[in-house]
Swiss-Prot record:
InterPro entries for the chain: ConA-like_dom_sf, L-lectin, Lectin_LegA_CS, Lectin_legB_Mn/Ca_BS, Legume_lectin_dom, Leguminous_Lectin
Listed GO MF terms: carbohydrate binding
Protein name per UniProt: Lectin
Species this protein is from: Phaseolus lunatus (Lima bean)
Glycan-bearing residues: N53, N82, N100, N129, N205
Stated family: Belongs to the leguminous lectin family.
First and last residue of the signal peptide: 1-21
UniProt keyword annotations, A-Z: Calcium, Glycoprotein, Lectin, Manganese, Signal
Function noted in UniProt: This metalloglycoprotein, containing Ca(2+), Mn(2+), binds glycoconjugates containing terminal non-reducing alpha-D-GalNAc residues.
Amino acid sequence: MASSVLLVLSLFLVLLLTQASAELFFNFQTFNAANLILQGNAVSSKGHLLLTNVTHNGEPSVASSGRALYSAPIQIRDSTGNASSTPTSHSYTLQQIFQNVTDDPAWLFALVPVDSQPKKKGRLLGLFNKSENDINALTVAVEFDTCHNLDWDKNSIAVNLGIGSVPWNFRDYDGQNADVLITYDSSTKFLAVSLFYPITGKRNNVSANVELEKVLDDWVSVGFSATSGAYETHDVLSSSFASKLSSLDECPTGENLLNKIL
C-alpha cells in the first residue's frame, strides 16, 4: 500500500452583504448527531464528523458517500429578495492513500434545498443527478477535488466552483494546514475563493459571478458532502456559521431542529 498523507484545512466562508439585522449563529467545536442531519455514510464519532466510510484498517472504502447538514433550515434571502450575509469557518482533516482510483474523491461545502436527499455518488459528489447543468438541483457548492481525472478534470487537482476552477497541487502540501476564505458580495454578485498555506505562503484563487438569489431557495440546508473512491477519508473537526438578513421570516411549515439520520 502506498504511503498515506494528512492535510488539515481550515475553511472560512464569508458571504458579504450591505444590509443585515436578523442574525443566526451556531458553533460546533465538537459534533453531536442530535444537531445534525446525517445522510449516506456520514457519522459523528468522538466529536468529529466522518463523511465517508473507512475499513477496519482505517483505510477509505470504495464508492462511499456521505452528507452532513445542520438540522435547522437557514434563511438565505428574505421576502424582499435580498441575499444573506453568512460568515462561517470549518476545520478539516483529509487522509489520502495514493493508489489507482475508479471514482473521484472530493469534499464540498454546500448550500442545498431543505429536505433534499443524497444524489448520485462519485463524480456527481452526492449533490447532483446528472453531469450536465442540473437546473433542478438548486445547489451552490465549493469543491476541493484532490484527484485528477483525465476524463472530467481540465486542470490538475483543483478547487472548483463548478463554473470555474484553479489547480491545487495537493501532494505538494502533505500535512500542512491550509486556510480557505470564501466571500460573496451580493451587490456585485461576486463569489471568490482563496486557498492559503501559511507555512509556504502559497495562495490559490478562483472566482465567479453568481446570483445566489436566482440559484437557491429562500431557505436552504447548510453543510458538507463528500465522496471517496478508495482514495481518501474526509473528517470535519469543527464548524461555525452565522447568517445575517435585513429581516427574518418564519421557518417553513413542518421544518424543525430534529436530527434525521438516513
